[in-house]
């Protein structure tokens, strides 16, 4: 196994661990999920460029009669990248004591203010940063609002 193959295996493993964490483990952490909201996807073009570059590497490897293992690993990397960017939905998970946004748990006590912009972006101000949350469906903003009203403490 070459160094290139080893690097590809490491990247594929890291991406798979991230996908498993995002899809399964995050749902089980910090208690029961009270509300799950799908967010708008970002960086579609970036992934398309990444997969295109991997396609070029696959083509070069095949034309240069490179190792078949490298080709399979590149195809695997492309498939994982497509899954993470196009099949999996980014989500906002509300728990009893806080919520997961961008794979980070944020406690409700850190929220200083919440606003809704004119174009349907939920703005949550924390102590030191501002979260701009774009939901997939605008109806989900009402679900979030109702969730906060019901669970206000």
Swiss-Prot record:
Localization per record: Cell inner membrane
The UniProt entry lists membrane topology as:
Multi-pass membrane protein
Which Pfam families does the record cross-reference, listed alphabetically?
DUF986 (PF06173)
Q: Give me the segments passing through the membrane.
A: 6-26, 45-65, 67-87
For this record, the Gene Ontology CC terms, alphabetical, are: plasma membrane
Keywords recorded for this protein, A-Z: Cell inner membrane, Cell membrane, Membrane, Transmembrane, Transmembrane helix
Q: Which InterPro entries match?
A: DUF986
NCBIfam families in UniProt: PRK02913.1
Family label: Belongs to the UPF0266 family.
Q: What is this protein called?
A: UPF0266 membrane protein YPO1755/y2554/YP_1637
Native organism is Yersinia pestis
